[in-house]
């Protein structure tokens, strides 16, 4: 499956040219933003880790081995990509134990930048946001056109698609999810089950968002929409008054789409009809998610780009800096600008 099938149409028109992303790890930098004051005491050792050429799970295994503890005692807030320079927090549960020597975990691919104690472990999804610094190299596009589109994106946001990398190479994760859904069965391995259920939900969300992008309503509240604030998981239904809420215009409040689970779409009016039609087309996937015990949640359709700045270090290099809420994809922004040219034989651009 191609990117258009897995995501949907662009919001701002065709790509303005092409570029390479991640020719080196430094071209894709991610800093986890964690709004948790650390107490300096407790049985959990929190580590601020810089890694390159190493994914989060591999880093956790290295830390566990060096600390002499079970992998189950090592926690992290979110998964970060292997092909990047990333900085993120880990925690290690060490009840009644002194800080271990973690030197064996460190080399040119992993550095521990800070270590401190806290009373609680790091929970999945605990980070508030991710800060990105991207360098698009071998840029073949008109700078004036890029600048104009970035100004529009800063003012209006972008469709909050799950990135193509969520679906695996050529959509392989989705193919696997459909296969399991056709049998209404679940993989026994927990990590495989979690990955494929997440893939199915992401695809259904993208389908609903694609329909809203196609009809031009992805950033407009309609009566029956379920609205949510950027950093909130709660939502409320829009009536006529809510559709003119000034917080919509300043990108604080947004229409949402379905993360499918038990029951019909809780949206109303035309929005309910659109989402239910999508669910009817993908009945096997929806029934599979319900059978797996997933509850219905919502995700904002429009993604505001925090602190967006850009410049050109060289005529053929575009550097972007911005902040996104946790769980959102930097490649969704890049996609609105240019087509990415694969580096060597690499087909997947990044994990955000």
UniProtKB/Swiss-Prot annotation:
GO terms for molecular function: RNA binding; tRNA pseudouridine(13) synthase activity. The active site is at 81 (nucleophile). Its EC number is 5.4.99.27. Gene3D superfamilies: TruD, catalytic domain, TruD, insertion domain. It catalyses: uridine(13) in tRNA = pseudouridine(13) in tRNA. GO terms for biological process: tRNA pseudouridine synthesis. Residues 157-303 form the TRUD domain. One of its GO terms (cellular component) is cytosol. It is an enzyme of class 5 (isomerase). InterPro entries: PsdUridine_synth_cat_dom_sf (IPR020103), PsdUridine_synth_TruD (IPR001656), PsdUridine_synth_TruD_CS (IPR020119), PsdUridine_synth_TruD_insert (IPR011760), TruD_catalytic (IPR042214), TruD_insert_sf (IPR043165), TruD_pseudoU_synthase (IPR050170). Keywords: Isomerase, tRNA processing. The keyword Cell cycle does not apply. Belongs to the pseudouridine synthase TruD family. Responsible for synthesis of pseudouridine from uracil-13 in transfer RNAs. NCBIfam families: PRK00984.1-2. This is tRNA pseudouridine synthase D. The lineage of its organism: Bacteria, Pseudomonadati, Pseudomonadota, Gammaproteobacteria, Pseudomonadales. The gene is truD.
